[in-house]
């Protein structure tokens, strides 16, 4: 098979691992920077050209590893590849859906998937009511555009919540205000979903004095055993987004597991090293089983 990895940085652990496993399985692999791609829009012969002017060849499968900062352009390139009949591991519409944090929460709520109580605002006039909607302090305030734990603040008191929200109000920032689950302070669980199965899971523990468990914020990851309920919720969350491969972040509360976030380009390094599971290899095996050209009547989803 000819496989493209759509990514801006070929040196990241995840991208090197995917390339190595695909090549070890006998496939031809190219890492394609989406920012170097440009496209024509044509009814009969859509094309993607690459830096230097050469048209991209047809790939049997595309693995999108699109960073959050280039979601719009990266998914546009991916969508064009879909119109050309290329199989994409995660489809452009699913990535866009999961990157819109509030939209993803709306979809999860519609499916009855449990999550923390959340409100959404942009420069709210009534800060007090916004706080009241999620049950009061302590609460978590998140910038809608934040990733890897950045732009996430814990307000321990009512006054600090008011001050933080009012500060964001001055920036005209889109924010999520979310109830804080005290019993999960400093921990979360990353479930790695491929297809309709959780293939690996780790518990992430924040460093001392930090409530964000993200490995990028200095947290540590250790292998964890999931309950059947946690597995089912993680798979349902990924399926709701339409993602074939996803990192689903859960927390354990006194009333059961809650979904925090769904990542369409989950990192491999922390979870592979903590579990000794070859996730890159499992992704390539999944592609080998599932990759088929997209039929003409399924090439564009809007």
UniProtKB/Swiss-Prot annotation:
Mg(2+) 2 binds at residues 261, 263. One of its GO terms (molecular function) is metal ion binding. Residues 105-288 form the ATP-grasp domain. GO terms for cellular component: cytoplasm. Keywords: ATP-binding, Ligase, Magnesium, Manganese, Metal-binding, Nucleotide-binding, Protein biosynthesis. It is an enzyme of class 6 (ligase). It comes from the Bacteria. Its EC number is 6.3.2.-. The keyword Transferase does not apply. SUPFAM superfamilies: Glutathione synthetase ATP-binding domain-like (SSF56059). Pfam families: RimK, Rimk_N. ATP binds at residues 142, 179-180, 188, 212-214. InterPro entries: ATP-grasp, ATP-grasp_RimK-type, ATP_grasp_subdomain_1, RimK, Rimk_N, Rp_bS6_RimK/Lys_biosynth_LsyX. Mn(2+) 2 binds at residues 261, 263. PANTHER family: RIBOSOMAL PROTEIN BS6--L-GLUTAMATE LIGASE (PTHR21621:SF7), RIBOSOMAL PROTEIN S6 MODIFICATION PROTEIN (PTHR21621). Belongs to the RimK family. This is Probable alpha-L-glutamate ligase.
